[in-house]
Amino acid sequence: IKNCIETSPLFSILKKMPKGGILHLHTSSSGDANWLVKRAIADENCYIYTQDDGSVLQGKMAVFPKGTAPPGFRPMHELAAKDNHFITKVVEMITLTPEDSASPNPWDKFEACFERVGGLVYYAPIFIDYYRQSFEALAADNIQIVELRAGSGEFNGLYDINGNNYSSDEGI
């Protein structure tokens, strides 16, 4: 149905129209999930937790200097090279579906999505690219106003591969 809607003449007219705004947009979910996963795969320092042992959330993504990833974390670029469905599998772990919202505990999946991507979106190189991509997509859709929802200290969580942390002023 989604494809039918997106290819309809009415949808193309609506796409060109100016929009109001997006309110309460979470900073770590403002971008395209496919783009984020592909960007992570392009960075050899991005890892994903692959075990289902309860010690770390399966699918949690993080950035580590080469050779320092804790047990259970595997390089995303290596997994993607071996599995043609890797991107789809990861996107499903970080995206809410209608089935998730109908489940008895939809907040569990919602919170897990944020936990899975948090290690990526606050890694400075990805953060910069992620926001650029996010705002370019919003501008292309004629969104006029964006209200970002950032928790206290959220922009203080920015870091780089050398272990440097950045202040909220530097993050913004």
Give the role of each language-model region:
Residues 1-172:
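Metal-cofactor-binding active-site regions of metalloenzymes
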